[in-house]
Amino acid sequence: MSKDKKNEDKETLEELKELSEWQKRNQEYLKKKAEEEAALAEEKEKERQARMGEESEKSEDKQDQESETDQEDSESAKEESEEKVASSEADKEKEEKEEPESKEKEEQDKKLAKKATKEKPAKAKIPGIHILRAFTILFPSLLLLFVSAYLLSPYATMKDIRVEGTVQTTADDIRQASGIQDSDYTINLLLDKAKYEKQIKSNYWVESAQLVYQFPTKFTIKVKEYDIVAYYISGENHYPILSSGQLETSSVSLNSLPETYLSVLFNDSEQIKVFVSELAQISPELKAAIQKVELAPSKVTSDLIRLTMNDSDEVLVPLSEMSKKLPYYSKIKPQLSEPSVVDMEAGIYSYTVADKLIMEAEEKAKQEAKEAEKKQEEEQKKQEEESNRNQTTQRSSRR
């Protein structure tokens, strides 16, 4: 027996050497646990035997004492003793069942220990707050790096600029007015859109401008030009008058003129602005009926103008009151049977063109008569002066 024990001890030592420290600790723990369970089982067995002895002694004492009692009491005592015996047997059975269960638990613990040695330890999870802090630092840094790299690259100044809506102007004129340079950053155009749109509107032809961006580098300048409302005529030259009240300084070719247009025979900048402003308040039908506008100041009204209509009618109206008084012409027109003059200087009345010619002829005759009288008076004065001079010379010669 001693040899067998020695051999077993040697084998266990060799196994312990081969095992890792953790496995050694695990085996030691399992051995201790098995020893403790065996000790507990022995204590339980001793307690059970002691209980059985006490119960048997008590039952004997009771039997002696109860021998004098009725038969019914003896039967009940027997039943109680039988129940106790049955309970003791049940305790034995439970203990017998617990022993294999404890062995099974030991085997399961060994298996779990082996699995734990094979499995790798689980990685600790990173708390969410640390991830959030790292994100708040890394994201701005990466964004700044990306923006810096973009600004240093040639893509930062790459632009494809197109112009739409030009009729009287050219795309080059619009680009020049915008002030956009090849060296300007694309991001500056996006951030300062309003500034560039305002610069484009510095071109007097442009009524409105819109700078539209399309990814990645395309820009479209959408332009709306002022309309041409009339032409200032000087000899054979025609200068456009815009709806803004601006008079174009360069004339247009006769081939580019529309079939019908409004002719203006004065070029004062303030008067043209007032005329365009008043004209904008008149209906399109009445505008289309006007053929020519010229100044016709009188002694009473300095800004009186004469409008020659397409049907040969003439309208005299103050320039500052044109939008108020001219619409009445549409009501008077059906009453005119022949070309007439509608005078709106003070009140409204009309007369025929023939009467006008007669009146003009009479006025011319009066003016000519006045001029003739003036000439006669001047000649008489000259003659009197000459006669006076002659008399003075004669007197001086006599002396």
Curated annotation (Swiss-Prot):
Where do the POTRA domain residues begin and end? 156-226
In terms of superkingdom, the source organism counts as Bacteria
The keyword Cell cycle is annotated on this UniProt entry: yes
Q: Does the keyword Membrane apply?
A: yes
Q: Where is the composition biased (Polar residues)?
A: 389-399
**Compositional bias per record (Basic and acidic residues), positions renumbered to this chain:** 35-65, 75-119, 364-388
Q: Which UniProt keywords apply?
A: Cell cycle, Cell division, Cell membrane, Membrane, Transmembrane, Transmembrane helix
Q: What does this protein do?
A: Cell division protein that may be involved in stabilizing or promoting the assembly of the division complex.
Q: Which family does it belong to?
A: Belongs to the FtsQ/DivIB family. DivIB subfamily.
What name does this protein carry?
Cell division protein DivIB
Show the taxonomic lineage: Bacteria, Bacillati, Bacillota, Bacilli, Lactobacillales
